[in-house]
């Protein structure tokens, strides 16, 4: 965890700009577990147990409006959703009272005692209140029951029973009239139809700790509930999703990751003119293990903040939620499941409350400030804070290092670039090699004795008469021309096509149960290459029909395959430490790089820069190789390999940790190479500059085993900025979507189980979908705008290890641990 003085960067200015304590009062009785309430300009809290106090933030005299009517300590209160009239409901063991604040203020000005309307009496200990969106109904949570009270008639519309423990939170669904969601100390939530009083859905037990808070996000149609141990549970409320779980988040771990990234970035420093907090809130030498109970959840829309304040936050990634905890306030992003900002009470000497027992939050749209009402965990202090979210985010968001980075090449190759040197050297030697080749051709044209059968000297014999010359090119021409015509006539990839979910052909890649390590389509979508654990490389027709072409020669599992951009060559790397380039047409070996050339086995290998280079990773470094394939066939010296490669440059990761994945674009010119390391980082290399350009620390909770870039295809086009998106995945940590321009995670996908085996991921050619394998014998398809999966593809017989989208048609190929290949087609 960072030191308090390191929490805020020099961009934030004075700490007093972030949070101001506007009001402080001390009650004779503790209100640490009382439901507090905030409206746009009013804060409500109990004073001395039975008095309901309303403090108006716009009143310069700080006059309290005190409402009396309860004889027992107030346990809960809630504001209405309408401004005129502004209602507030309060509850105690004796009464549930509804107050009209406008009428109460008028009576106070007239010197009269304000009175409320008793909604109910002796309902029990009320822990939570919530008014409906139209202020017609109030939900009163007393014990394990929920009473739906009509505000106009004070009648009980319905009594909801089913929880096994006290109900701690309740929310009305904004888009479903009559739907109510409740959370309880029984560690589950329930969905009700409060109009009929019926139960719609009941969750299982989520945690070992009680649920304390609820929040419904209308835009993403998600439910967020918080536990006493700092766990956040997120569920989908979309129709047809059946309240499935989207993610589970540990708030403590997320805050630690947030702090670690800032420390490793090295961009955050101490502000020069800030009043720094003390390093210990409880005294010198004392250390207390505090939990992060989620006391309250409230909406936080960072889109209202000026872009200059948000820094590298994208406009699509500003829907967040405020988390009120005992130690501080946190801005949590529902898209990428990350903490965007953290405000610890102990970091501000001006704050009177360092540990909170209850809190309430409300956004003010007029000035984009946030009202926070806190009650001390120990004692009777109650404080009103005014928070500036723009200053908070600006102080903690480090300047983006990726703003100048772009996957599509945006500048010419520099003379000092390894790319320039590799191409320039090739061009300089091209003329000489052509001259030597021409000389060899001239020599080959001379009549030699051993080129034909000879009976004596051979030169005096008459030449043989050609009796019959078969047209051996008929078959190849027909097949090739048909293939080329079909390739040229293929339609563009349908951008608005449906997800390929219809099961198609399924074949076994090998006679025995053999793991499929990797799969990749050719650029024209006609062929599918598969690397197997039995040392073979197979090439299937895209329809998985016919007999596959077999490429044999490796002595280990083939863990990487790659097609060249012109589809003439295939690259394969295996556990035996060798790299082989094959002729895709004849299944012949064209280039062999032995294990003696690499310090460690090759982890990743691919063509790069439109087939100009080979890019591979071995140990802590990746190598850029220039290659030459000799296509001339010499029957005499066919045993001698004339194809060759040359090392242009090698670059190592920061810290010299072994690489686990490597990715670069080959279909168009790009200077960017992405590498993942065993230290859970993703490093960006700029080969135009020949160095590391940026490092993403703590990219996942475990090492990334695959990076997948949005490369599109030659059959469809995307916006140029879309090519800056890439996916990463790690065992047990789902899949993350990143933007190279901001070096930020834009979305986190967690709906598929991958707890022990590295499963593959893939981008669709249109860039709208991402697919991934899973251990539950299913493949999952996500839409880029949603954190939960849109389709779950069944029909597999084992763990789905690899997925690949056809670049020319809406097809998805999957590979399994037992060696099966499965096609999915669009409906």
Curated annotation (Swiss-Prot):
InterPro entries given in the database record: Quinoprotein_ADH-like_sf, WD40/YVTN_repeat-like_dom_sf, WD40_rpt, WDR27
Gene3D superfamilies, per the entry: YVTN repeat-like/Quinoprotein amine dehydrogenase
The protein's name: WD repeat-containing protein 27
WD repeats: 3-57, 62-101, 112-151, 155-194, 201-237, 292-337, 344-387, 502-542, 546-584, 590-629, 646-687, 698-740, 746-784, 788-826
Keywords, alphabetical: Repeat, WD repeat
Biological source species: Homo sapiens (Human)
The encoding gene: WDR27
A single Gene Ontology CC term: nucleoplasm
């Amino acid at each position: 965890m960072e030191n308090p003085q390191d929490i805020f960067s020099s961009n934030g200015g004075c700490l007093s700009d972030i949070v101001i304590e506007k009001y402080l009062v001390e009650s004779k009785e503790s209100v640490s577990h009382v439901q507090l309430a905030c409206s746009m300009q009013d804060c409500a809290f109990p004073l001395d147990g039975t008095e309901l106090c309303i403090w108006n933030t716009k009143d310069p005299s700080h006059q309290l409006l005190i409402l009396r009517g309860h004889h027992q300590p107030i346990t809960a209160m809630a504001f209405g959703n309408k401004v005129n009239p502004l209602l507030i409901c309060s509850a105690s063991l004796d009464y549930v009272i509804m107050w009209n604040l406008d009428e109460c203020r008028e009576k106070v000005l007239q010197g009269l005692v304000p009175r409320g309307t008793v909604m109910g009496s002796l309902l029990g200990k009320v822990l939570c209140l919530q008014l409906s969106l139209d202020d017609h109904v109030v939900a009163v949570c007393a014990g394990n029951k929920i009473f739906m009270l009509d505000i106009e008639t004070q009648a009980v519309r319905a009594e909801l029973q089913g929880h096994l423990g006290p109900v701690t939170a309740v929310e009305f669904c904004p888009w479903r009239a009559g739907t109510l969601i409740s959370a309880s100390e029984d560690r589950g939530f329930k969905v009700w139809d409060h109009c009929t009083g019926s139960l719609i859905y009941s969750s299982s037990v989520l945690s070992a700790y009680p649920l304390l808070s609820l929040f419904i996000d209308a835009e993403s149609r998600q439910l967020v509930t918080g536990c006493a141990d700092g766990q956040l549970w997120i569920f989908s409320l979309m129709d047809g999703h059946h309240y499935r779980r989207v993610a589970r988040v540990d708030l403590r771990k997320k805050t630690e990751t947030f702090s670690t990234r800032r420390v490793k970035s090295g961009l955050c420093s101490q502000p020069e003119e800030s009043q720094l907090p003390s390093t210990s809130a409880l005294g010198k030498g004392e250390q207390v293990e505090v939990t992060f109970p989620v006391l309250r959840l409230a909406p936080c829309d960072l889109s209202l903040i000026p872009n200059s304040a948000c820094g590298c936050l994208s406009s699509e990634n500003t829907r967040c939620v405020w988390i009120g905890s005992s130690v501080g306030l946190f801005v949590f992003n529902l898209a990428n499941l990350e903490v965007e900002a953290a405000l610890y009470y102990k970091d501000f000497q001006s704050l009177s409350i360092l540990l909170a027992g209850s809190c309430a939050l409300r956004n003010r749209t007029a000035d984009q400030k946030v009202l926070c009402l806190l009650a001390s965990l120990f004692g009777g202090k109650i404080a009103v804070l005014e928070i500036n979210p723009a200053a908070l985010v600006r102080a903690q968001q480090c300047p983006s290092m990726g703003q100048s980075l772009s996957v599509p090449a945006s500048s010419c190759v520099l003379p000092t670039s390894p790319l320039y040197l590799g191409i320039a050297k090739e061009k300089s030697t091209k003329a000489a090699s052509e001259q030597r080749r021409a000389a060899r051709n001239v020599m080959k044209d001379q009549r030699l004795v051993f080129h034909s059968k000879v009976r004596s000297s051979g030169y005096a014999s008459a030449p043989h008469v050609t009796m019959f010359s078969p047209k051996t090119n008929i078959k190849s021409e027909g097949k090739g021309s048909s293939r080329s015509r079909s390739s040229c006539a293929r339609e563009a990839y349908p951008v608005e096509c449906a997800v390929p979910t219809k099961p198609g052909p399924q074949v076994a890649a090998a006679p025995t149960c053999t793991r499929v390590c990797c799969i990749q389509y050719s650029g024209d979508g006609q062929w599918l290459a598969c690397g197997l654990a039995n040392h073979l490389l197979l090439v299937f027709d895209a329809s998985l029909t016919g007999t596959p072409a077999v490429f044999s020669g490796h002595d280990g599992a083939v863990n990487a395959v790659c097609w060249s951009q012109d589809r003439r060559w295939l690259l394969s790397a295996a556990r035996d430490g060798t790299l082989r380039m094959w002729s895709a047409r004849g299944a012949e070996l064209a280039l062999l790089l032995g294990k003696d050339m690499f310090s460690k086995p090759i982890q990743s290998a691919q063509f790069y820069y439109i087939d100009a280079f080979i890019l591979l990773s071995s140990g802590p470094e990746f190598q850029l190789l220039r290659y030459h394939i000799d296509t001339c066939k010499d029957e005499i010296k066919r045993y001698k390999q004339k194809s060759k490669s040359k090392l242009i440059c090698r670059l190592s990761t920061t810290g010299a940790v072994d690489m686990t994945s490597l990715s670069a674009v080959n279909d168009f010119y790009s200077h960017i190479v992405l590498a993942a390391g065993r230290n859970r980082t993703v490093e960006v290399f700029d080969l135009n500059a020949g160095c590391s350009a940026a490092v993403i620390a703590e990219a996942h909770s475990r090492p990334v085993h695959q990076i997948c870039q949005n490369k599109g295809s030659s059959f469809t086009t995307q916006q140029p900025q879309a090519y800056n998106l890439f996916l990463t995945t790690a065992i047990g940590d789902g899949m993350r979507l990143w933007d190279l321009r901001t070096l930020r995670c834009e979305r986190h996908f967690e709906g598929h189980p991958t707890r022990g085996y590295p499963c593959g991921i893939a981008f669709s050619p249109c860039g709208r979908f991402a697919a991934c394998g899973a251990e539950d014998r299913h493949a999952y398809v996500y839409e880029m705008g949603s954190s939960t999966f849109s389709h779950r593809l069944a029909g597999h017989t084992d763990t789905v290890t690899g997925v690949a989208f056809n670049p020319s048609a809406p097809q998805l190929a999957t590979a399994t641990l037992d060696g099966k290949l499965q096609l999915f087609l669009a409906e």
